[in-house]
Amino acid sequence: MQNKVIRLGEIEISNDKPFVLFGGMNVLESRDMAMQVCEAYVKVTEKLGVPYVFKASFDKANRSSIHSYRGPGMEQGLKIFQELKDTFGVKLITDVHEIYQCQPVAEVVDIIQLPAFLARQTDLVAAMAKTGAIINVKKPQFLSPGQMGNIVEKIEECGNDNVILCDRGTNFGYDNLVVDMLGFSVMKKVSKGCPVIFDVTHALQCRDPFGAASGGRRGQVTELARAGMAVGLAGLFLEAHPNPSQAKCDGPSALPLSALEGFVHQMKAIDDLVKHFPELDTAN
């Protein structure tokens, strides 16, 4: 199977190229924090030679509670994104939830993300595809890896073949997620070689069945990320925070920003090792 290569400036996103770190914070909490977090990622990735794309949400539209923080909104969020791009020269990824958001977001951001809960909404998928931007599709927790081919087909039928697939875990009973490591190769196959990345942060979610916000298992982020990187992936999707216990969204799953360099160093070492191995044909 031929692996597709998506080019984002000087960055090449592909399953057999050096991994790309899609890293940042869960939601934009403030302009100053976004600058702090982005600067930390840029310093680490430049030092280690890892291609980098900054990620954050301007609106967490699917929070469990109506009282939970959602973000600054699209208008203010895009201003912050533009400042990050101007200051650090980074590429950007963020999610959209409504059709009207697609075009204005695509004018600032390099990759627009289709949220897991909305991944089968055909009108939204079509609107995103028609912007011509690179599309990152989050695999719904309730969908098998093999079904992702149908979503890719929708995007391609709209004239856009710049598609990335992202696994963020699969429902395992109530209020728990697991990651099927065999699912990554299934997604590569059904998408005919699209880049596949791993959202290790959201895969660590573990809900309180009666709570208003997600819990998480950030103490296990390194183990889970190591396992995913050993498969051979196009990228890793990661959220970090200066003080996870005070984060306004998904703090229990966020990597402490102080641990970022050591974490990325390990992921790069695994990626370098795996991608130097020759591919073995064990199916025949």
UniProtKB/Swiss-Prot annotation:
State the EC number(s): 2.5.1.55
InterPro entries for the chain: Aldolase_TIM, DAHP1/KDSA, KDO8P_synthase
Reaction(s) catalysed (UniProt annotation): D-arabinose 5-phosphate + phosphoenolpyruvate + H2O = 3-deoxy-alpha-D-manno-2-octulosonate-8-phosphate + phosphate
Question: Which cysteine pairs make disulfide bonds?
Answer: none
Q: Name one GO cellular component term.
A: cytoplasm
In which domain of life is the source organism classified?
A: Bacteria
Q: Where in the cell is it found?
A: Cytoplasm
Q: Name one GO biological process term.
A: keto-3-deoxy-D-manno-octulosonic acid biosynthetic process
Q: What is its main location?
A: cytoplasm
Q: What class of enzyme is it?
A: transferase
> What pathway annotation does it carry?
Carbohydrate biosynthesis; 3-deoxy-D-manno-octulosonate biosynthesis; 3-deoxy-D-manno-octulosonate from D-ribulose 5-phosphate: step 2/3; Bacterial outer membrane biogenesis; lipopolysaccharide biosynthesis
Q: Which Gene3D superfamilies match?
A: Aldolase class I (3.20.20.70)
Keywords for the protein's UniProt record, in alphabetical order:
Cytoplasm, Lipopolysaccharide biosynthesis, Transferase
- GO MF annotation, one: 3-deoxy-8-phosphooctulonate synthase activity
State the similarity comment: Belongs to the KdsA family.
Protein name as annotated: 2-dehydro-3-deoxyphosphooctonate aldolase
| Species assigned in the record | Pasteurella multocida (strain Pm70)
> Species lineage, top-down?
Bacteria, Pseudomonadati, Pseudomonadota, Gammaproteobacteria, Pasteurellales
Question: Gene behind this chain?
Answer: kdsA
